[in-house]
């Protein structure tokens, strides 16, 4: 009797045909093929590789690889384990081209193979391949997972899950790798050898794939597209990370919070959020970080490096996302549109903060006094009132600031610098926010509208104060007399009636005033033409 070949009993579907089957049809296919495999195993038949090369040479992946992966999806793990173990004894993984079966066994041999190869690796890299611990007898089949893989790389990566071993130790940092190729690539990061240099910004790279991905940050090319939503990406890693949003699944899952990840490195970085581990330390200031990219970005605050330059105006940035956000100033692109009022924003973060003006959500609460805020910068700014400290301090007046941008704006109050000039009237301002608000006096724009009465306002603060007329809210209460106010400015003016403070002094006559409006009215009396409004009425 002729030997039975796999092709004699196989019920095959192409990838396209398989995708069209419903779940019940797929289950029927699995049942039939499991029974077929069981029968072959029971009579001791091996799968032959007759005409495999010719028959499948135009296929991207081997037929048997597809079949095994489909069978592995069965719910009955005891069924697949038993069948796979029988075929493994017949060297199934060697008989099926392109497929390796994970046996979850710790081998006694040096895992890279022949001793001559290991000597060669040691001579060239100076790194001794590790040996797996010898366990003696083969483990029980029930503890083996038999998961199939179509590539050696995927198979070796998966084995690490069972063995916990990696093959090569880096002598510089102690990091371990499971292949010579990967440790060679890693060693370059210590040597500083970066032969691939970007012609646009001069940034150098140690590996061609990283260099090509970087080039796309300048060209805008995004060759990898999500099949689910059409979103495009510059590298395959980004699209894999994105796909988790659609599938909700990844090969690595956090045991603490359940978040899935597409790669081992991303998963390990995430774990440090829970453990608090920060192994990457800045040599300049000692600040520690959970991953090396974050450290590299931080180091630019010390070096002043700004590798990302705007082609339109030449402004340079330390971070690529900052450049991308800046470019929208030139293009006018505002992809984030508020459904409530139609206002559009350049960045997702400012859009989210804006949405809270409609919902009233204030997720950030001060631990000292309980006051709540809609965004972190507002809370940090508030915290300075309690601590009296901030990372940035004015050298002239000693005022502390929570972030660099308001600190820079404040410095201009001392230097007199006003870099933002109104195109309509020529008036200059210290910040971009101030000029945007001022421009509304020319355009008449009033983006903040009261839902109660329809009245519109140019400024958010005016709108918020107006809303309190309807709600009756008066959050600022005087501790001396109990009088309450809607706005902090009105409250501060009132406090001066108790303290007697008069911070506005006339240089002409020395007279002092408690509020700016009274002071400005007084100053008109010293003007050359006198006050602008004079009563012309003559008594009879």
From Swiss-Prot:
Gene Ontology CC annotation, any one: nucleus
Record-linked SUPFAM superfamilies: beta-beta-alpha zinc fingers, KRAB domain (Kruppel-associated box)
Molecular function GO terms recorded: DNA binding; zinc ion binding
InterPro entries registered for this protein in UniProt: KRAB, KRAB_dom_sf, Znf_C2H2-type, Znf_C2H2_sf, Znf_C2H2_type
SMART domains: KRAB, ZnF_C2H2
Name of the protein this chain belongs to: Zinc finger protein 136
Kinase as UniProt keyword: no
GO biological-process terms attached to the record: regulation of DNA-templated transcription
Ranges annotated as C2H2-type zinc finger: 140-162, 168-190, 196-218, 224-246, 252-274, 280-302, 308-330, 336-358, 364-386, 392-414, 420-442, 448-470, 476-498, 504-526
Lineage: Eukaryota, Metazoa, Chordata, Craniata, Vertebrata
Protein family per UniProt: Belongs to the krueppel C2H2-type zinc-finger protein family.
Species name: Pongo abelii
């Amino acid at each position: 009797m002729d030997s039975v070949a796999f092709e004699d009993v196989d019920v095959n579907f192409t990838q396209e045909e398989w995708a069209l089957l419903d779940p019940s049809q797929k289950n029927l296919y699995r049942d039939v093929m499991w029974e077929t495999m069981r029968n072959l195993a029971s009579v001791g038949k091996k799968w032959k590789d007759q005409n495999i090369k010719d028959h499948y040479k135009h296929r991207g992946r081997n037929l048997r690889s597809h079949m095994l992966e489909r069978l592995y999806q069965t719910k009955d793990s005891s069924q697949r384990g038993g069948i796979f173990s029988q075929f493994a004894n017949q060297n199934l993984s060697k008989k099926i081209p392109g497929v390796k079966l994970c046996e979850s066994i710790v081998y006694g041999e040096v895992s890279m193979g022949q001793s001559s190869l290991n000597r060669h690796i040691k001579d060239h890299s100076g790194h001794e391949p590790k040996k797996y611990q010898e366990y003696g007898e083969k483990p029980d089949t029930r503890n083996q997972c038999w998961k199939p893989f179509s590539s050696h790389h995927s198979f070796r990566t998966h084995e690490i899950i069972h063995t916990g071993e990696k093959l090569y130790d880096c002598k510089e940092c102690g990091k371990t790798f499971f292949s010579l190729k990967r440790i060679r690539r890693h060693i370059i990061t210590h040597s500083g050898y970066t032969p691939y240099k970007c012609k646009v910004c001069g940034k150098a790279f140690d590996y061609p794939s990283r260099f090509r991905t970087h080039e796309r940050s300048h060209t805008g090319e995004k060759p990898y597209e999500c099949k689910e939503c059409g979103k495009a990406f510059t590298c395959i890693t980004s699209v894999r990370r994105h796909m988790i949003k659609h599938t909700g699944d990844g090969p690595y899952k956090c045991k603490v919070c359940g978040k899935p990840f597409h790669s081992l490195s991303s998963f390990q970085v995430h774990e440090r959020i829970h453990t608090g581990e920060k192994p990457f330390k800045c040599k300049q200031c000692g600040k520690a970080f959970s991953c090396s990219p974050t450290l590299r970005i931080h180091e630019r605050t010390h070096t002043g490096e700004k590798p990302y330059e705007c082609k339109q105006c030449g402004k340079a940035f330390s971070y690529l996302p900052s450049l991308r956000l800046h470019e929208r100033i030139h293009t006018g692109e505002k992809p984030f549109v508020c459904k409530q009022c139609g206002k559009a924003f350049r960045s997702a973060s400012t859009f989210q903060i804006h949405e809270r003006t409609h919902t009233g959500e204030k997720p950030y609460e001060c631990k000292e006094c309980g006051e709540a805020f809609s965004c972190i910068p507002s809370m940090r700014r508030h915290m300075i009132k309690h601590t009296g400290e901030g990372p940035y301090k004015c050298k002239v007046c000693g005022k502390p600031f929570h972030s660099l941008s308001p600190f820079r704006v404040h410095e201009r109050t001392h230097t007199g610098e006003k870099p933002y000039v109104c195109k309509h009237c020529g008036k200059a301002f210290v910040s971009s926010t101030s000029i945007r608000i001022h421009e509304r006096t020319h355009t008449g724009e009033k983006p903040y509208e009261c839902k109660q009465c329809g009245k519109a306002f140019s400024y958010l603060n005016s709108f918020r104060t107006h809303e309190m007329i309807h709600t009756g809210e008066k959050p600022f209460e005087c501790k001396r007399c109990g009088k309450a106010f809607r706005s902090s400015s009105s409250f501060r003016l009132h406090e001066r009636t108790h303290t007697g403070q008069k911070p506005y002094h006339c240089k002409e006559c020395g007279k002092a005033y408690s509020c700016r409006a009274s002071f400005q009215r007084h100053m008109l009396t010293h003007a050359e033409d006198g006050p602008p409004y004079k009563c012309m009425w003559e008594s009879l």
